[in-house]
Amino acid sequence: MYDKRSAFFLAGAAPNKGNTTRLSDIEVAVMTELPTSRSVLSDTLWAIKGQGVQAETLHLETLVRKPRTIKPSGAHTIIGGFAQLARFFPPGRDVLARIEDKLILELVPNLVPGRAIIFEDQYISTGGQLYEVLVGHDRFVGDLRSRLYPYLQTKGIVPGHVCHPYDACTFLIGQEAGCIITDCFGEAFDAPLDVLTDVGFLLFANQHIYQEVWPRLKRLISEEGF
């Protein structure tokens, strides 16, 4: 993370089903914050399937541990909060930004000059993106790269870096916290538990956000041709 902000150690454990093992088979997941050199606090979050989420904050100097409350946002809209599509790597950032802007204009057709309508946080860490939703900072994060890049390849554009299953191995924590997580086609999130498969995801803080964003986002993606 270039010492700009926290990175995350991610781990998920699943029964070994050989080549058929999938992310949905993960039964235990843990993520530990690796803070910057200027920070003395580190959060660890973990979940066991069907048993909810637990978390604690460790003070790295005193070694004191305190319970950490995990509570995704209960907001009914992304307006006024943090919500974004991941576009920290080229190519296709123009396409993703265009989709975002169209989505916002549909939600707020009568923009007030000078008003901050929505915020974005391009956190270059899938673990960091999940964390920000889990603690209530972000309301929606989407990663459409695995869906967008094959489309761009048909136009002769070289694809960029994408998310992989090991980046998403702690999504069980989000599910246990009550978040809505789908793949980038709006289907149940899942993928082979390997290191090569390209994956995408849509991470909604709650059902209200899902109902507001997904139907519109689905149509806007289709209008862009991918």
Tell what function each PLM region has.
Residues 19-27, 31-226:
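An extended, acidic
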Residues 1-26:
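Glycine-rich active-site/cofactor-binding loop and its immediate structural neighborhood
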